[in-house]
């Protein structure tokens, strides 16, 4: 498979993309980033009646389960990654993480919530910002 930058450059112009397609691309790039860090993705787009968790991964180095919120941007109009995660969003992520954990037999030494921001379109290569342990 070609590198991420070649793959992204070969896609159609961003102006023709739907929000869902841009979000899916951002999640794919976030998963590749997590893989490069040695993390193992357990689930993607886990849903329940209270919402959705974008990516659930295991960080073997920290013996932690990591709930990852992915924010994909094509402009800076909506602020950066840190501004995208409000206290209300953190509360929702914690609640969803608790529900996901309640349905599992496996236990981890730690639970963490990370945010990955993916900025597409400003440069030839997507910009990835990974904030660890936001909650």
Curated annotation (Swiss-Prot):
Gene3D superfamilies reported for this sequence: 3.40.1350.10
Pfam families reported in the protein's UniProt record: UPF0102
One example GO MF annotation: nucleic acid binding
CDD domains: PoNe_Nuclease
Superkingdom in the source lineage: Bacteria
Database matches in InterPro entries: Restrct_endonuc-II-like, tRNA_endonuc-like_dom_sf, UPF0102_YraN-like
Family: Belongs to the UPF0102 family.
Cross-referenced NCBIfam families: PRK12497.1-3 (NF009150), PRK12497.3-1 (NF009153), PRK12497.3-3 (NF009154)
Protein name: UPF0102 protein Mkms_2031
Organism whose genome encodes this protein: Mycobacterium sp. (strain KMS)
Higher taxonomy: Bacteria, Bacillati, Actinomycetota, Actinomycetes, Mycobacteriales
